[in-house]
């Protein structure tokens, strides 16, 4: 009897690896948010915003290595950025990656990369509420972007097992975690950095 045909990849599922797949026994497929707009959806656009049709397929897959626990259940509850809050949030790392934390307890600050899974992904021109003019997606720090990856420099309070307690996050509870990196002030800081349109807005 011939072997049954493999099932199609299901978003969000843990799928057996394909023969010869070097990534191991399980592959984690990314899962679209339940309330995410469909590709190229014109609903919910503000005046002047432009949405495009998203590519038919992804070029790479991600492993979500954990979840972020915060006090905020909706986007409106979240602080505008992590420096506006002193709330201690918890990063729950999947136990399989726990050995990767060795040495991280010695750092004071770390860079947290996370996936804004509730954000739409098809806008190329946006009209942010707090800006009078339209801006291109890549000129903004908005979570709305083709790949909704967010980055935050956080202050590490302590590590307990596979849980990290940090200050400086601004995301909703349950946000998927992509990566953790130590923050090096010597190479990661750019004191002379500027964003011209933002500086002009403050004048």
Which functions belong to the PLM regions below?
Residues 1-3, 9, 15-28:
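Intrinsically disordered, low-complexity serine/threonine-rich segments
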Residues 3-8, 13, 66, 150-152:
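Small-side-chain structural scaffolding
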Residues 30-153, 157-203:
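Glycine-rich, low-complexity intrinsically disordered segments
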């Amino acid at each position: 009897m011939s072997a049954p045909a493999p099932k199609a990849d299901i978003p969000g599922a843990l799928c057996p690896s394909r023969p010869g797949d070097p990534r191991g026994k399980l592959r984690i497929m990314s899962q679209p948010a339940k309330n995410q707009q469909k590709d190229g959806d014109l609903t919910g656009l503000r005046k002047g915003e432009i949405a495009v049709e998203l590519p038919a397929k992804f070029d790479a897959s991600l492993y979500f290595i954990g979840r972020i626990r915060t006090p905020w259940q909706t986007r409106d509850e979240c602080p505008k950025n992590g420096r506006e809050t002193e709330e201690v949030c918890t990063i729950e790392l999947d136990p399989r990656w726990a050995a990767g934390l060795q040495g991280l307890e010695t750092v004071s600050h770390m860079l947290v990369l996370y996936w804004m899974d509730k954000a739409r992904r098809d806008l190329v021109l946006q009209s942010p509420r707090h800006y009078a003019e339209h801006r291109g997606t890549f000129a903004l720090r908005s979570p709305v972007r083709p790949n909704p990856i967010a980055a935050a420099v956080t202050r590490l309070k302590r590590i307990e097992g596979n849980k990290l307690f940090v200050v400086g996050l601004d995301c909703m509870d349950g946000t998927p975690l992509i990566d953790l990196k130590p923050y090096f002030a010597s190479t990661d800081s750019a004191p002379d950095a500027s964003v011209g349109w933002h500086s002009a807005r403050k004048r």
